[in-house]
Amino acid sequence: MPSNTIGSDGTITRDARSRYRQRAEGGAHGAFEAETKRAGGTPRADVQVDRGQAPADVAAILGGTGEVVIRRRRMYTGERLVQLADTYIPAYVAEAAPAVAQLDTGTGGIISRMADAGLAQTDVVEDVTQVPASPEQAEALGVEPSTLLLTITHTGRTEDGRAVEVTRHVLSPGWTLRYGVPLD
């Protein structure tokens, strides 16, 4: 099964089992672009890159309160906004892999740029929660404020356990998340 499918009713099913391994497929600049193209969609992302402080819970995962690179993305399939994604990258990672602070991170996206710099992610944990939409999220996604939205907090770690990326994905209504666990 492809990692994303879009049903005739607009429901997006995200299958995480192969999502990150296929991030550079067809020259894609990350998992979202690759999976959207595989599903027959037209991916687009509006990207802003800044430096600043991560929220306290994200800073705790990253191991400190120092400056981070913040990549804010609005991600579309065609003209439909399907998710908001904010990525927080420690400054030392951005110094080692400067392309992560660029608007265009190249084929394979930030995960590939980190790997190129010797900071390959070998473990990813994604926590899925429901959170009330903030006024800004509600306006962007066309829902009422406080509408419960699925949020995925993605943490990428290196082989030695260092968190090198935390991305918070806030999904528009209509998503199904599918996870598989090998039993061998």
Positions of PLM-derived features:
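HTH-adjacent hinge/linker in prokaryotic transcriptional regulators
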Residues: 1-60, 64-65, 94-105, 111-112, ...
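Hydrophobic alpha-helical segments, especially N-terminal targeting/anchoring helices
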Residues: 6, 75-76, 157
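Short beta-strand-initiation
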Residues: 31, 57, 66-70, 136, ...
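Hydrophobic residues on conserved beta-strands that form the core of alpha/beta folds
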Residues: 44-46, 70-71, 84, 151-152, ...
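C-terminal regulatory/effector modules of DNA-binding transcriptional regulators
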Residues: 63, 80, 91-93, 100-184
